[in-house]
């Protein structure tokens, strides 16, 4: 199974970008990772077993590229999260609070939470994408949820004061 590059981009660019941004927390680096991902797709000659395999491959490449970019010495200067938040449209005010809290999590929790709740992947799929055990992913999701709960409770308690 193989899609034309522009069709693959149309279907998956938003998800690839969101996955990259969840790691880099920088719109420019997320754009770079997205472009690099689709460039690799365009130059790849192999077919995929299914559309799910294609999507998983794109996300895996984007995650790896985003990690490369975020670890680069030249990329340490990142755009403030607030600058990026202004470009997003949220359905409800609490959506932006939740997104901000997710982006503040340590990377290992942030990526697992993003893939599970924003991309809809199951534990086993996340484990395969990240090269981790399913038990590790479950722990990261549980700990990430606990950190989110605490962060959001603190924020809401501060708002009530």
Spans of features found by a protein language model:
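Arg/Lys-rich amphipathic alpha helix in sigma70-family domain 2
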Residues: 49, 60-81, 91, 143
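Short, small-hydrophobic-rich alpha-helical interface motif
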Residues: 16, 20, 30-41, 61, ...
